[in-house]
Amino acid sequence: MSIFPTKILLATDASEEAALAVRTAADIAQRTGSELHVVHVGSSLEYVGMGPPQIGDIPAPTQEQLSAEARGLLDAEVGQVKAAGGTVAQAHLGVGAPDREIVELAEKLSVGLVVIGSRGRGGIRRALMGSVSDSVVRHAHCPVLVVRAEKSEREEGSDLDDMMLT
Protein backbone atom coordinates (compact mmCIF):
# COMPACT_ATOMS: atom_id res chain seq x y z
CA MET A 1 0.00 0.00 0.00
CA SER A 2 1.37 3.39 -1.01
CA ILE A 3 1.27 6.46 1.19
CA PHE A 4 0.61 8.52 -1.93
CA PRO A 5 -2.90 9.11 -3.25
CA THR A 6 -4.04 7.31 -6.39
CA LYS A 7 -6.49 10.10 -7.23
CA ILE A 8 -6.07 13.85 -6.74
CA LEU A 9 -8.75 16.51 -7.13
CA LEU A 10 -7.58 19.99 -8.12
CA ALA A 11 -10.25 22.54 -7.24
CA THR A 12 -9.71 25.79 -9.08
CA ASP A 13 -11.47 29.09 -9.62
CA ALA A 14 -9.32 30.03 -12.62
CA SER A 15 -7.86 33.00 -10.74
CA GLU A 16 -4.27 34.16 -10.91
CA GLU A 17 -3.89 32.99 -7.31
CA ALA A 18 -4.82 29.45 -8.37
CA ALA A 19 -1.89 29.14 -10.80
CA LEU A 20 0.52 27.83 -8.17
CA ALA A 21 -2.07 25.27 -7.01
CA VAL A 22 -2.41 24.08 -10.62
CA ARG A 23 1.35 23.59 -10.99
CA THR A 24 1.60 21.93 -7.57
CA ALA A 25 -1.22 19.46 -8.28
CA ALA A 26 0.25 18.60 -11.69
CA ASP A 27 3.67 18.06 -10.10
CA ILE A 28 2.36 15.83 -7.30
CA ALA A 29 0.24 13.76 -9.71
CA GLN A 30 3.17 13.33 -12.08
CA ARG A 31 5.63 12.31 -9.34
CA THR A 32 3.25 9.90 -7.62
CA GLY A 33 1.57 8.46 -10.71
CA SER A 34 -1.79 9.66 -9.41
CA GLU A 35 -4.86 10.26 -11.53
CA LEU A 36 -5.60 14.01 -11.63
CA HIS A 37 -9.14 15.37 -11.77
CA VAL A 38 -9.86 19.10 -12.16
CA VAL A 39 -13.03 20.84 -10.98
CA HIS A 40 -14.34 24.37 -11.46
CA VAL A 41 -17.50 25.32 -9.56
CA GLY A 42 -19.64 28.33 -10.39
CA SER A 43 -22.16 29.63 -7.87
CA SER A 44 -25.74 28.69 -8.67
CA LEU A 45 -26.71 32.37 -8.92
CA GLU A 46 -24.34 32.80 -11.85
CA TYR A 47 -25.93 29.91 -13.70
CA VAL A 48 -29.61 30.76 -13.33
CA GLY A 49 -29.36 34.02 -15.22
CA MET A 50 -28.98 36.21 -12.13
CA GLY A 51 -25.89 37.87 -13.55
CA PRO A 52 -25.59 41.60 -14.12
CA PRO A 53 -28.94 43.39 -14.50
CA GLN A 54 -30.19 44.25 -17.94
CA ILE A 55 -29.22 47.76 -19.02
CA GLY A 56 -31.08 49.29 -21.96
CA ASP A 57 -30.98 46.95 -24.95
CA ILE A 58 -28.16 44.81 -23.53
CA PRO A 59 -29.68 41.51 -22.34
CA ALA A 60 -28.55 39.78 -19.16
CA PRO A 61 -26.36 36.74 -19.86
CA THR A 62 -28.25 33.52 -20.44
CA GLN A 63 -27.60 30.30 -18.59
CA GLU A 64 -26.03 28.89 -21.75
CA GLN A 65 -23.63 31.84 -22.02
CA LEU A 66 -22.63 31.52 -18.38
CA SER A 67 -22.16 27.77 -18.69
CA ALA A 68 -20.04 28.29 -21.80
CA GLU A 69 -17.93 30.85 -19.94
CA ALA A 70 -17.44 28.44 -17.01
CA ARG A 71 -16.54 25.62 -19.43
CA GLY A 72 -13.99 27.96 -21.05
CA LEU A 73 -12.42 28.67 -17.65
CA LEU A 74 -12.26 24.95 -16.89
CA ASP A 75 -10.71 24.22 -20.29
CA ALA A 76 -8.10 26.93 -19.64
CA GLU A 77 -7.21 25.30 -16.30
CA VAL A 78 -6.88 21.91 -17.99
CA GLY A 79 -4.56 23.61 -20.49
CA GLN A 80 -2.46 24.98 -17.61
CA VAL A 81 -2.17 21.50 -16.09
CA LYS A 82 -0.98 20.15 -19.45
CA ALA A 83 1.47 23.05 -19.83
CA ALA A 84 2.88 22.15 -16.41
CA GLY A 85 3.53 18.61 -17.66
CA GLY A 86 0.46 17.03 -16.09
CA THR A 87 -2.27 14.81 -17.49
CA VAL A 88 -5.93 15.30 -16.60
CA ALA A 89 -7.99 12.14 -16.13
CA GLN A 90 -11.26 14.07 -16.16
CA ALA A 91 -12.50 17.66 -15.95
CA HIS A 92 -15.62 18.40 -13.88
CA LEU A 93 -17.89 21.44 -13.98
CA GLY A 94 -19.99 22.03 -10.86
CA VAL A 95 -22.79 24.42 -10.02
CA GLY A 96 -23.64 25.50 -6.48
CA ALA A 97 -21.76 26.33 -3.32
CA PRO A 98 -18.10 25.70 -4.26
CA ASP A 99 -17.07 24.21 -0.90
CA ARG A 100 -19.98 21.74 -0.85
CA GLU A 101 -19.54 20.77 -4.51
CA ILE A 102 -15.80 20.17 -4.05
CA VAL A 103 -16.29 18.03 -0.92
CA GLU A 104 -19.07 15.99 -2.55
CA LEU A 105 -17.06 15.39 -5.73
CA ALA A 106 -13.97 14.40 -3.73
CA GLU A 107 -16.05 11.83 -1.88
CA LYS A 108 -17.79 10.57 -5.04
CA LEU A 109 -14.44 10.08 -6.80
CA SER A 110 -12.79 8.61 -3.66
CA VAL A 111 -9.80 10.91 -4.06
CA GLY A 112 -6.89 10.67 -1.66
CA LEU A 113 -5.97 14.36 -1.81
CA VAL A 114 -7.66 17.66 -2.66
CA VAL A 115 -5.43 20.51 -3.84
CA ILE A 116 -6.94 23.99 -3.63
CA GLY A 117 -5.60 27.51 -3.85
CA SER A 118 -6.12 30.20 -1.26
CA ARG A 119 -6.50 33.88 -1.96
CA GLY A 120 -4.98 34.80 1.40
CA ARG A 121 -7.72 37.23 2.41
CA GLY A 122 -7.33 39.27 5.57
CA GLY A 123 -8.95 38.24 8.85
CA ILE A 124 -12.00 40.52 8.77
CA ARG A 125 -12.89 39.79 5.17
CA ARG A 126 -12.39 36.07 5.73
CA ALA A 127 -14.56 36.15 8.88
CA LEU A 128 -17.38 37.92 7.06
CA MET A 129 -17.26 36.00 3.79
CA GLY A 130 -15.90 32.66 4.89
CA SER A 131 -13.34 30.74 2.92
CA VAL A 132 -13.91 27.95 0.45
CA SER A 133 -10.54 26.41 1.28
CA ASP A 134 -11.24 26.55 5.05
CA SER A 135 -14.58 24.83 4.57
CA VAL A 136 -13.09 22.14 2.32
CA VAL A 137 -10.38 21.47 4.92
CA ARG A 138 -13.04 21.07 7.63
CA HIS A 139 -15.42 18.86 5.67
CA ALA A 140 -13.38 16.74 3.24
CA HIS A 141 -12.97 13.03 3.93
CA CYS A 142 -9.31 13.15 2.85
CA PRO A 143 -6.24 15.37 3.29
CA VAL A 144 -6.43 18.82 1.70
CA LEU A 145 -3.39 20.75 0.49
CA VAL A 146 -4.07 24.50 0.53
CA VAL A 147 -1.61 26.31 -1.71
CA ARG A 148 -1.29 29.98 -0.93
CA ALA A 149 0.26 32.15 -3.60
CA GLU A 150 2.75 34.63 -2.22
CA LYS A 151 3.15 38.11 -3.65
CA SER A 152 6.54 36.97 -4.88
CA GLU A 153 5.08 33.82 -6.43
CA ARG A 154 7.69 31.71 -8.18
CA GLU A 155 7.19 31.51 -11.94
CA GLU A 156 9.41 28.46 -12.49
CA GLY A 157 7.30 25.87 -10.68
CA SER A 158 6.04 24.66 -7.37
CA ASP A 159 9.42 23.93 -5.77
CA LEU A 160 8.09 20.52 -4.84
CA ASP A 161 11.69 19.24 -4.93
CA ASP A 162 12.26 21.10 -1.67
CA MET A 163 9.11 19.66 -0.05
CA MET A 164 9.27 15.97 -1.00
CA LEU A 165 11.73 13.41 0.24
CA THR A 166 13.59 11.78 -2.61
What name fits each language-model region?
Residues 142-150:
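Short, flexible loop segments at boundaries between secondary-structure elements
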Residues 57-72:
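A short acidic, glycine-rich active-site loop
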Residues 113-135, 153-157:
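Glycine-rich, Arg-bearing micro-motifs that act as flexible, cationic patches
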Residues 39, 90-94, 145:
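General small-molecule cofactor/ligand-binding pocket signal
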Residues 21, 48-51, 103-104, 126-128, ...:
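Short, well-ordered secondary-structure micro-motifs
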Residues 2-57, 152, 161-166:
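Small/aliphatic-rich secondary-structure junction motif
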Residues 1-4, 17, 79-114, 151-166:
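Structural beta-alpha unit
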